[in-house]
Regions:
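Low-complexity, acidic Ser/Thr/Pro/Gly-rich terminal tails and inter-domain linkers that flank the onset
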Residues: 35-82, 86
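Short, solvent-exposed beta-strand/turn "edge" segments of beta-rich domains on protein surfaces
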Residues: 73-86, 97-102, 182-188
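Extended low-complexity, serine/threonine- and proline-enriched intrinsically disordered segments
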Residues: 100-139
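Internal, hydrophobic beta-strand segments that form the core of beta-sheet-rich folds
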Residues: 160-206
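Extended, solvent-exposed segments with strong compositional bias
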Residues: 127-177
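C-terminal motif of bacterial Sec signal peptides marking the signal peptidase cleavage site
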Residues: 18-21
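Short beta-strand elements
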Residues: 204-226
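Bacterial signal peptide processing site
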Residues: 23-25
């Protein structure tokens, strides 16, 4: 009887070891500095991305804008779903605006969702932000050709989002388990970043204020297409 108990325990330990060996390792993370490090200079990871041109019209006058989206260079063509990441979102004037205009950013909405050929997964939202900037002293943040407004968007891992996990497994399913990078990439080809910038244009001559929006949709591939 004692021998049977030992044999059962060994079998159970073997099963645990096999399961542990099959578990997918955590995805690669951003560079982190050890808190015990004596290094004082912080080295930012190289960022790469895309710039987009926009034109808004106020009282028949055109204003040129440039939006910019950058991510860690290592993830440029290898978007990672299961590790938090940061996308730098920014906007500025591309050309000088009329002198009587003060242009400010008053709101930024952004979200990241899955891009997939399967309707069940396509559009499933990973994370989002909605920033009301009207509480700033001037009712927003001024931008010019030399001064942009930049907002780092810290995108949470899909495994930090309970709604995403339920959506991936099916809302009516009772199955709940953390998702692996391998499984998500098997059913998707990347992520889509959508942004809406709300701008306030103040005419200092007439004392009127106008509101305009510009939006972008940016595809971030998670692997090269075969």
């Amino acid at each position: 009887m004692h021998f049977k108990k030992i044999a059962f325990a060994l079998t159970a330990l073997t099963a645990v070891a096999i399961l542990a060996g099959c578990e997918e390792e955590a995805s690669k993370t951003m560079h982190a500095v050890n808190i015990n490090s004596t290094e004082k200079t912080v080295q930012e990871s190289p960022k790469k991305g895309i710039d987009r041109d926009h034109t808004i019209t106020v009282n028949g006058q055109e204003i040129q804008l440039e939006t910019s989206y950058k991510v860690d260079e290592r993830n440029l063509n290898d978007y990672v779903f299961t590790t938090p990441s940061i996308a730098d979102l920014s906007v500025k004037l591309k050309n000088d605006a009329p002198q009587n205009y003060n242009i400010r950013v008053t709101n930024l909405y952004a979200d990241v969702s899955v891009s997939s050929k399967y309707s069940r997964f396509n559009g499933l939202r990973q994370d989002s932000i909605n920033l009301n900037l009207t509480q700033a002293p001037n009712g927003g943040y001024d931008i010019s050709t030399t001064d942009d407004y930049t907002q780092p968007f810290q995108i949470e891992s899909v495994n930090q989002n309970e709604s995403f996990i339920h959506g991936w497994n099916g809302y009516i399913s009772e199955h709940y388990s953390y998702l692996t990078e391998r499984d998500i990439k098997k059913h998707s080809n990347g992520a889509v970043l959508r942004t809406v910038w709300t701008l306030s244009i103040e005419d200092t001559q007439t004392r009127k204020t106008y509101s305009k929006t510009v939006s972008d949709t940016i595809f971030m591939p998670s692997h090269n297409e075969e």
